[in-house]
């Protein structure tokens, strides 16, 4: 098992709080992660130490790793079907993909991350936690990524980009009727109103804002859900039955 370690800290780099600052896992974590709670606890420790040292998480986030990051991510699990194949776009420190993989071992999870240092961190974390998760260095808009992962049941993301870009990246990675699940902030509804036309033009349907984890998160996770619509039937130039101009 490979240990997730720090990089050499630069002068004036972030001061890493002690692991004790994380505190014990909240009771809701035991309900979400069940027998894999120890794995979730270890992930929290990695985020609060190596994650801070390597610039993937701010030092001020350590005391709220559970509520703001891990539980906020895992709350989306209730929106996923059994055995769903999901791709985490712009995974960064592994949010939301790693908490979902811990909470739901039935899921097939791919972590997609374009930056080398982040993808290396993700590979180390996945190895240390013993997760059956694939880490891929790449961007959602790249053709090789779309060719390989263009049939996912769900594309998840968290604080990656505005909905216009995120929809354009997500839809080509989904099977028809697959869903984009984007964890957003409290202004998610405003963002949906702003970009609804662009989202529809990019193939999104049934766009709505849902909340998850309201019984244990304050505030609950706010998620923009959108289904990939089936494309219209292509016109047939050979038969001449394409319709009128």
UniProtKB/Swiss-Prot annotation:
InterPro entries reported in the protein's UniProt record? rRNA_ssu_MeTfrase_G, SAM-dependent_MTases_sf
Please give an example of a GO cellular component term from this record.
Answer: cytosol
Q: Where is this region: Disordered?
A: 223-245
Protein localization: Cytoplasm
Q: Cite a single Pfam family from the UniProt record.
A: GidB
Tell me, what is one Gene Ontology molecular-function annotation carried by this entry? rRNA (guanine-N7-)-methyltransferase activity
- Please give the function described in this protein's UniProt entry: Specifically methylates the N7 position of guanine in position 518 of 16S rRNA.
**Known NCBIfam families for this protein?**
rsmG_gidB (TIGR00138)
* Protein name as catalogued: Ribosomal RNA small subunit methyltransferase G
Q: Which gene encodes it?
A: rsmG
